[in-house]
Amino acid sequence: MNTFGNIYRLTSFGESHGPGIGGVIDGCPAGIELDTAFIQQELNRRKPGQSRITTPRKEDDEVQFLSGIYEGKTTGTPIGFIIWNKNQHSSDYDNMKTVYRPSHADYTYQTKYGIRDPRGGGRSSARETIARCVAGAIAKLALKQYGIQIQAYTSQVGPIKLAGSYQDYDLSLTEKSDVRCPDPKTASEMETLIAEVKSKGDTIGGVITCVAKGVPVGLGEPVFGKLHAALGHAMLTINAVKGFEYGDGFNAAFFRGSERNDRFFNDNGHINTRTNNSGGIQGGISNGQDIYFRVAFKSVATILMEQETVNMEGEDTILKARGRHDPCVLPRAVPIVESMTAMTLLDYLLIQKTRENF
């Protein structure tokens, strides 16, 4: 499927080394002020060539809107857009045309479709996620009207991780480091590790934490449309994602109800909770507390080291990849996680609004 969402929907198209990546957004509310500078800023956070710890591929990543906008506002009709690819080095993939990269989508795409575009991974490339960042930026602008804010950050790279919870850090510092970690000391250690891994032609994974504040009570559609299930689905569609947990996640298995339950209390006329182990979601429905979750990313499959593999004829061979690749996806994946979160929350907010007049 190339379409995400129920009411607020994105259909993306394009390949890594094709002419461009684009999309069509349907179901966007009319009248949203389209802050093009903000949208470009979001794309810049994701684009390649940002620092020594990202891919050296250089792209302008400037979005061109084709429809659905008049005098700077959304019209409620489909929003078409495209971002042109300008810096492809397709010859870097000549030695991969008939060879499968270990842990990459090469083999599964070839087997499923009987054909694949080997240049940069084609449709399986994370280059596709730029379309999500456009749709996510517009979703953020819509959510801003409801006081909903989303902030993601790198909380772990390999064995190096932040201690404590998101509440222990000033998340406004996230964008001040190349790795997008809000703690300067830990960020420096992460960047050093990524640079070391890159120098050896290897890659490394990690974890991104995301927090959504200001989400009202009531978003989520039991029983098969639970909000945490929707967020999990959204995250697991992102390239290289291998795990998702919200609230206290797997740690919930180690505690008794008397230890873990989020107790309610009257907070000056408002219902609040003493703790937030549930991660802002109970029974699949938002409860008004901060929604927070973690997303685990594997190391990038394409490494510049010799690997045992097979070719399309099933013959054993050795592959040493070439090209420009991220040694760690985390720095550029932070805005992607935020975008998928924004799209999901706006979608579920619009679903909830269909109930208000009944």
Curated annotation (Swiss-Prot):
GO terms for molecular function: chorismate synthase activity; FMN binding. It is an enzyme of class 4 (lyase). CDD domains: Chorismate_synthase. InterPro entries: Chorismate_synth (IPR000453), Chorismate_synth_AroC_sf (IPR035904), Chorismate_synthase_CS (IPR020541). SUPFAM superfamilies: Chorismate synthase, AroC (SSF103263). NADP(+) binds at residues 46, 52. GO terms for biological process: amino acid biosynthetic process; aromatic amino acid family biosynthetic process; chorismate biosynthetic process. Coiled coil: none annotated. Reduced FMN (FMNH(2)). Its cofactor is FMNH2. Its EC number is 4.2.3.5. FMN binds at residues 123-125, 239-240, 283, 298-302, 324. Pfam families: Chorismate_synt. Pathway: Metabolic intermediate biosynthesis; chorismate biosynthesis; chorismate from D-erythrose 4-phosphate and phosphoenolpyruvate: step 7/7. It catalyses: 5-O-(1-carboxyvinyl)-3-phosphoshikimate = chorismate + phosphate. Keywords: Amino-acid biosynthesis, Aromatic amino acid biosynthesis, FAD, Flavoprotein, FMN, Lyase, NADP. Belongs to the chorismate synthase family. This reaction introduces a second double bond into the aromatic ring system. Homotetramer. This is Chorismate synthase. The lineage of its organism: Bacteria, Pseudomonadati, Bacteroidota, Bacteroidia, Bacteroidales.
